[in-house]
Amino acid sequence: MSRSLKKGPYIEYKLLKKIEELNKQEAKKTLKTWSRSSTIIPQMIGHTIAVYNGKQFFPVFISDQMVGHKLGEFVPTRNFRSHVKSDRKTKR
């Protein structure tokens, strides 16, 4: 179920204030955030936000096509480790 339109998109308050401050200064700095559930808004376009995946921060450059999505969608949280096919040499 999606969020109600009358409520507006969810954005962490501290992250929003940092973005607004950088827009006033016209500075391009990397912001660290743990808020994977924050929605990307048009004011974030052009900024780099380092999103925490549970182990480390991944830098995400925000483009206009990302507006409306969540920050956590662009950061992988799990590593895929496939099973190695057993060779005939190892069976000997």
Swiss-Prot record:
<dbReference type="InterPro" id="IPR002222">
    <property type="entry name" value="Ribosomal_uS19"/>
</dbReference>
<dbReference type="InterPro" id="IPR023575">
    <property type="entry name" value="Ribosomal_uS19_SF"/>
</dbReference>
<comment type="similarity">
    <text>Belongs to the universal ribosomal protein uS19 family.</text>
</comment>
<keyword id="KW-0687">Ribonucleoprotein</keyword>
<dbReference type="GO" id="GO:0019843">
    <property type="term" value="F:rRNA binding"/>
</dbReference>
<keyword id="KW-0689">Ribosomal protein</keyword>
<protein>
    <recommendedName>
        <fullName>Small ribosomal subunit protein uS19c</fullName>
    </recommendedName>
</protein>
<comment type="function">
    <text>Protein S19 forms a complex with S13 that binds strongly to the 16S ribosomal RNA.</text>
</comment>
<keyword id="KW-0694">RNA-binding</keyword>
<dbReference type="GO" id="GO:0000028">
    <property type="term" value="P:ribosomal small subunit assembly"/>
</dbReference>
<keyword id="KW-0150">Chloroplast</keyword>
<dbReference type="GO" id="GO:0003735">
    <property type="term" value="F:structural constituent of ribosome"/>
</dbReference>
<dbReference type="GO" id="GO:0009507">
    <property type="term" value="C:chloroplast"/>
</dbReference>
<dbReference type="InterPro" id="IPR020934">
    <property type="entry name" value="Ribosomal_uS19_CS"/>
</dbReference>
<keyword id="KW-0934">Plastid</keyword>
<dbReference type="Pfam" id="PF00203">
    <property type="entry name" value="Ribosomal_S19"/>
</dbReference>
<dbReference type="InterPro" id="IPR005732">
    <property type="entry name" value="Ribosomal_uS19_bac-type"/>
</dbReference>
<dbReference type="GO" id="GO:0005763">
    <property type="term" value="C:mitochondrial small ribosomal subunit"/>
</dbReference>
<dbReference type="GO" id="GO:0006412">
    <property type="term" value="P:translation"/>
</dbReference>
<keyword id="KW-0699">rRNA-binding</keyword>
